[in-house]
């Protein structure tokens, strides 16, 4: 409230600055060794004129040979479904998440079925991934997730997981079945965190690779004496003014260097993908 008792956001428009980036982990590019696995993450972002912003990050299962396919399909699919839902309900807290989940599963199943092979095998190979995202509307902000990952609200990170046997829940286990869901059926559904947007300055979501990013604050960029610094720096203006700044920051952290005859990998062993937003009013 201001001195007149009027909320400071009344009569002002929500404005969310967005930055996003993804880099493959060193365990995927395997510096100095003749092997390669694709970046298995996917992300999608949508911003509307009213300021409403949606972001989704999907992290493909490392055991899936081509799980990046499902992750990169699911992220924009889920963003589109949320856009459709918000067009009817306006406020994020009124979204019906069981319907959203079922619609996403149905769309992914349509694609998987068209691939013309054993459906269970197709899902295991292509469509196992974790999901985390945020919705920012003028009224409220929702963090939503199935599986592990990291979300950051007003600079404070929250790590989701780890899960028993290092086996996070994947959305498409709803089709294949899994001991993960047998142990805890609630893991098959989106979990939610709600905030009043007027109380937020920043929000971010990322895959579990962001945990490694958080642990690197005291280390130096490979081949330099420059300290990486705290993760909070990515919410400062330079990372939003230059759309490539965040990607370059992650890429510098994962640059491989030569030490004599040995190749030293970068600092991020897992694929690292995140979307961050600074929240303001104009």
Each predicted region: which residue ranges?
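Catalytic core of PPM/PP2C metal-dependent serine/threonine phosphatase domains
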Residues: 90-152, 187-197, 260-269, 277
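C-terminal catalytic subdomain
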Residues: 2, 183-282
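Short helix/loop capping segments that flank catalytic or ligand/cofactor-binding pockets
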Residues: 65-67, 153-155, 213-216
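PP2C/PPM family metal-dependent serine/threonine protein phosphatase catalytic domain
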Residues: 20-37, 109-122, 153-198, 252-260
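Short hydrophobic beta-strand that contains or immediately precedes a catalytic carboxylate
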Residues: 55-58, 144-146, 204-206
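Helix-loop-helix
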Residues: 77-111, 222-252
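Short Gly/aromatic-enriched secondary-structure transition segments
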Residues: 69-73, 158-159, 218-225
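N-terminal entry segment of metal-dependent catalytic domains or homologous docking segments
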Residues: 1-80, 149, 182, 266-275
